[in-house]
Amino acid sequence: MAVQRTFSIIKPDAVAKNVIGKIVSRFETNGLKVVASKMKHLSRQEAEGFYAVHKDRPFFKDLVDFMVSGPVVLQVLEGEDAIAKNRTLMGATDPKKAEPGTIRADFAESIDANAVHGSDAPETAAVEIAYFFPASEVYAGR
């Protein structure tokens, strides 16, 4: 397995519940290192740009509305097989279908307010990381 970087968002619902530390602890306990992090209240333009791939989907407006409803925590995580590991830790998109002990099973309320976002592939991770973090803001995790 190779060391990878992945992008993570702790979404407004989880920030509002004050579970940021609990979520980050899950990442770190499972071998993922935080190599970049910032809290930000996304503008509508930032959220629309980030989720542009979903622009023509019926849920796009609700997704953008939710993502601008409060602050988020943007992070770059690094570790062995980081993308798959993060997706396993997050659990299924719908928290009702997420395995017990996953972030979404423990902290998410609904398929919309589902606590976290994580990249799904190396190419996606690279684009998502670059969207919010210039290279100078991402530090070597070794």
Swiss-Prot record:
UniProt-recorded Gene Ontology molecular function terms: ATP binding; metal ion binding; nucleoside diphosphate kinase activity
GO cellular component: cytoplasm
PROSITE patterns: NDPK (PS00469), NDPK_LIKE (PS51374)
Chief location category: cytoplasm
Record carries keyword Protein transport: no
EC code(s) of this entry: 2.7.4.6
SMART domains: NDK
Keyword Cytoplasm annotated: yes
Cofactor(s) recorded in Swiss-Prot or TrEMBL: Mg(2+)
UniProtKB keywords: ATP-binding, Cytoplasm, Kinase, Magnesium, Metal-binding, Nucleotide metabolism, Nucleotide-binding, Phosphoprotein, Transferase
GO biological process: CTP biosynthetic process; GTP biosynthetic process; UTP biosynthetic process
Recorded catalytic activity of this chain's protein: a 2'-deoxyribonucleoside 5'-diphosphate + ATP = a 2'-deoxyribonucleoside 5'-triphosphate + ADP; a ribonucleoside 5'-diphosphate + ATP = a ribonucleoside 5'-triphosphate + ADP
SUPFAM superfamilies: Nucleoside diphosphate kinase, NDK
Its job: Major role in the synthesis of nucleoside triphosphates other than ATP. The ATP gamma phosphate is transferred to the NDP beta phosphate via a ping-pong mechanism, using a phosphorylated active-site intermediate.
Assembly: Homotetramer.
Entry protein name: Nucleoside diphosphate kinase
Provenance organism: Thiobacillus denitrificans (strain ATCC 25259 / T1)
